[in-house]
Amino acid sequence: MKGLIDISPALRVGMGVFPGDADFAVSQTFTIGPDCPVNVASFAMSTHCGAHVDAPLHYDPLGASIDMLDLGDFIGPARVIDARGKDPLCGFEEIASALDGAPPRLLLKLMDRGDQLTWPTGFRALAPETVERLALRGVRLIGVDVPSVDPETSKSLPSHMVCRRHDVRIVENLVLADVIPGDYELIALPLKLRGLDAAPVRAVLRRLGSQ
């Protein structure tokens, strides 16, 4: 559709997943042939495969599940910010100049990631102080183009914990490589999976002023 930018990776067999998590898998239930008029496939995947929203339940045993979240958080004005850098954690000062007049949804381009099939070992994440200061500025949703807002090896998940305290929504594994920094409308609705800790999204951006 005119004006839409797809920022979701294709879900496919062989794509990178968090170490130890379930692989994306597909099986064929029915195949078109002399005795069958249709193709029907089934698939299995982790709730954190591809572009997805983390529910508070993911990092808080008493947190809300994905079906309980307000959908309004995932639709509305958003700003894409180039937050690439050499340090393993993105500091607030690196993006501060891009925040003037920013809407409550921020999408951060943290690394050059062209191949979504390959797991991005050592990916750049967010310093918890960065998340804290963004939340205090009124940011309600943070999206990143890496698998997690915390480093791959983190066990304490400090940036997730800041999001928990401030009730900030998290969208991970977006495709932002070719998106020009600036302001857009974000549409990233998570699937309504009752009682689960996360859900995949088909996230898109709409250029402001487009129909």
Language model features with spans:
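Active-/binding-site microenvironments in catalytic and ligand-binding cores
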Residues: M1-Q211
